[in-house]
Amino acid sequence: MARQQTLKQAKVATGSEKHLYTFEVLIVSGPLALSFVKKNKVISRTIQMRGDQTLEQLHQAIFSAFEREEEHMYEFQVGGKGPMDPQARRYELGLDDGDAGQEARAAGDVERTRIGMLGVKENEAFGYWFDFGDNWWHQINVLAIEEKAGRGKYPKVTKRVGKSPPQYVDWDEEEE
């Protein structure tokens, strides 16, 4: 399946809300048919975002870049050793619903947390978990943090590697 990349030691440079962030988003696990994986060994999208944009906007960019059709719950995990690290800070959707247990474990709400607030550095990685039932796990590598964004609309997908997997696999068809 898609390789989980190991990144070099983080550089000293951190970002802010004025900076431009370049992320490589890799699918590291999920309900992928073997026939699809054989044809698409690496599945990634490179996305650029401004530091004043939110994690919700990053989610929407990933959702669109991988051509997903149905929304599901998701979270970002930042500050750990990559995706699935239980020690990472979790940023979740909709903390206003009064779920005290959820609020206690979440570091923030994706709709209010801006990219520049995360404190990520170049060459760091963080996780994105989409669809808590089907468990699509992604590793997001911070490829670059530039002083300021150029003109144009952001978020912006700048590179696609591999085809977008179907959101739902027809396992009956796969067995034939």
Language-model segments: which ranges?
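Short linear regulatory motifs enriched in tryptophan with gly/pro/ser
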Residues: 1-176
